[in-house]
Amino acid sequence: MGCDDKCGCAVPCPGGKDCRCTSGSGGQREHTTCGCGEHCECSPCTCGRATMPSGRENRRANCSCGASCNCASCASA
């Protein structure tokens, strides 16, 4: 599976709470965390994630980060 450049989640998101990348040829998997320390799920971060678009869309996973989210991957230009 391909991974994005934010948190290592599979793209497209497979659903569920397991968003991992295969590392090496042995099939071992590496659990990835986000800049804010939250575990990686469908969104690069889950801290204050909004369900409706808030102007800070995470276009990689079709999720939106809430206004209180200060993760680098949720930064808006």
Curated annotation (Swiss-Prot):
Keywords: Metal-binding, Metal-thiolate cluster, Zinc. The keyword Electron transport does not apply. The keyword DNA repair does not apply. GO terms for molecular function: zinc ion binding. Pfam families: Metallothio_PEC. Binds 5 molecules of zinc. May have a role in Zn(2+) homeostasis during embryogenesis. PANTHER family: EC PROTEIN HOMOLOG, METALLOTHIONEIN-LIKE PROTEIN 4A-RELATED. Belongs to the metallothionein superfamily. Type 15 family. This is EC protein homolog. It comes from Zea mays (Maize).
